[in-house]
């Protein structure tokens, strides 16, 4: 199943709600991800531009997009960024295909 990096930044309202009532939001979102056929592989809270970082497996880009839209529509997030990930073997295969594409950069 494809892997995705999801980076989530909470809105001010989202942080206010979490400070008022601290809770494990990873466990709160797990059922929604699983309902779409996905699985949380790992999750962390983070400092910086994004507050939560997830590595998830989702059946397809459509499913990964659906959960990102659901997160964004909930109102607690100011940003949701989803990045498709390649395994090392997939990346090597992509490199081999790139070599065979005969693409030439402009001179």
Predicted region positions:
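A compositional/biophysical signature of low hydrophobicity enriched in polar/charged and small residues
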Residues: 1-107
